Amino acid sequence: MELEELGIREECGVFGCIASGEWPTQLDVPHVITLGLVGLQHRGQESAGIVTSDGSSVPTFKSHKGMGLVNHVFTEDNLKKLYVSNLGIGHTRYATTGKCELENCQPFVVETLHGKIAVAHNGELVNAARLRKKLLRHGIGLSTSSDSEMITQLLAYTPPQEQDDTPDWVARIKNLMKEAPTAYSLLIMHRDVIYAVRDPYGNRPLCIGRLIPVSDINDKEKKTSETEGWVVSSESCSFLSIGARYYREVLPGEIVEISRHNVQTLDIISRSEGNPVAFCIFEYVYFARPDSMFEDQMVYTVRYRCGQQLAIEAPVDADLVSTVPESATPAALAYAGKCGLPYVEVLCKNRYVGRTFIQPNMRLRQLGVAKKFGVLSDNFKGKRIVLVDDSIVRGNTISPIIKLLKESGAKEVHIRVASPPIKYPCFMGINIPTKEELIANKPEFDHLAEYLGANSVVYLSVEGLVSSVQEGIKFKKQKEKKHDIMIQENGNGLECFEKSGHCTACLTGKYPVELEW
């Protein structure tokens, strides 16, 4: 909850769709993409955009972008502008680099030597400053402050070995990966295909789904359904609402070509010798929707295991367990079950107080939490509460909640946090306050319970979080071939023979790559 209130947020979500079969298609591609972006709304609420194409040899790109939520940006009239399309990509954005302005809305479209490309990007380049200087030195102008535009221009820039008459997009993407090791998941649309790309460290998520007939959606045993199209998304949670089945993840370093005919791996780029995969562990903790799948496990299940581990590490004598609505609910339920305590709601959330609620005067500022939460005091008067939260960032939000509960009759309030203390900024696509703003780096952290007004405060350990995440991952036997990940076809797509790894830089200060300034 506190992550949401205090500006720790995912940068964006990407979504693409391509129709199978005969073109022009009967599939309503713009609506499919819009619904996909609605499913990714939690990943970005500042702006949204869609670019579609007819997929011809000289394609017509149609674009609509705007500030605000997906449903506000894409009205029926706006969607009509995107019709007669067979494929397209979309984007919903939060800003980590680049201002919150219309010019920074994605997808970006540029003209290249071989026609237009459209690019949607989730992540943040760790060496953006150096790449910006390099592009400017080569005479390539940049019209925005977004590092995503730099990716687009790097892709448009012809590699020295490429012949003028034959675009080699794999070479261009590999050149990008050489220039920028992390962090990005990309959708690149050119003519009649979409390229889905994940950086070699796999820091940002990306997965593929298969559009099937509506009549077959609920028949999970039917494996030979007609394929009406392919979709690719930051998270699998967006698939169900559009009638798609989860197919597989895009692997770290993988370049996938998605066409009207099939999905095929063009290449998999390895990391520097000895460097592990570094998937962002906070996708599990907070950013992803609980019904999404990463590494063959549901996010909700991981959060539940975190709650169980928290109960093992930090039990306390109490009467009930509750949560600050609502991202920590799985962890709170698990904590309660493990400790043999009842789970009871103590707060109800006012869902119509938005994230950007304006507090125009001191009285409203002082009311603070009371505007956002109602108190279910009959559930906890005279009782000892264990309140489970997903994080404590600055401490500005949880402290008023503790005060509110105690003033409403709670005998004790014990805080249990289902993730470790955040001590370091992220430079790979997550907007985290400066190191000095984080409560874990302040003198008050040594007596945090007293500072917050709680009876006790305990975080989940880093080891506990990592074990909770990795417990459910079905490791395959690792095989190597020239340092690349070996893949093979199976019934559900591709099978990866590599042990997973996770980035914990915001918790430990150990970044997967050397940072450049």
From Swiss-Prot:
Question: Sorted alphabetically, which Gene3D superfamilies does this protein's record hold?
Answer: 3.40.50.2020, Glutamine Phosphoribosylpyrophosphate, subunit 1, domain 1 (3.60.20.10)
Q: Which Pfam families match?
A: GATase_6, Pribosyltran
Q: Where is the Glutamine amidotransferase type-2 domain?
A: 12-261
- Top-level taxon of the source organism: Eukaryota
Which cofactor does the UniProt annotation name?
Mg(2+); [4Fe-4S] cluster
The UniProt entry, under PROSITE patterns, shows: GATASE_TYPE_2, PUR_PYR_PR_TRANSFER
Any GO MF annotation of the entry: 4 iron, 4 sulfur cluster binding
Task: Give GO terms for biological process.
Answer: 'de novo' AMP biosynthetic process; 'de novo' IMP biosynthetic process; 'de novo' XMP biosynthetic process; GMP biosynthetic process; purine nucleobase biosynthetic process; purine nucleotide biosynthetic process
Q: Mind telling me which residue stretches traverse the membrane in this protein? A: none
N-acetylmethionine occurs at which residues?
M1
Q: What EC number is given for this enzyme?
A: 2.4.2.14
Claim: Iron is one of the keywords in the record:
yes
Q: What class of enzyme is it?
A: transferase
> What is annotated as the active site?
C12 (nucleophile)
Q: Where does Mg(2+) bind?
A: S327, D389, D390
Which UniProt key words apply to this protein?
4Fe-4S, Acetylation, Allosteric enzyme, Glutamine amidotransferase, Glycosyltransferase, Iron, Iron-sulfur, Magnesium, Metal-binding, Purine biosynthesis, Transferase
**Pro-peptide positions on chain:** 1-11
Q: How is the cofactor bound?
A: Binds 1 Mg(2+) ion per subunit.
Q: Which NCBIfam families match?
A: purF
Q: Which PANTHER family match?
A: AMIDOPHOSPHORIBOSYLTRANSFERASE
- Do you know which HAMAP family this protein is assigned to? PurF
What's the subunit arrangement here?
Homotetramer.
The record's comment on protein family reads: In the C-terminal section; belongs to the purine/pyrimidine phosphoribosyltransferase family.
Q: What does this protein do?
A: Catalyzes the formation of phosphoribosylamine from phosphoribosylpyrophosphate (PRPP) and glutamine.
| Protein name per UniProt | Amidophosphoribosyltransferase
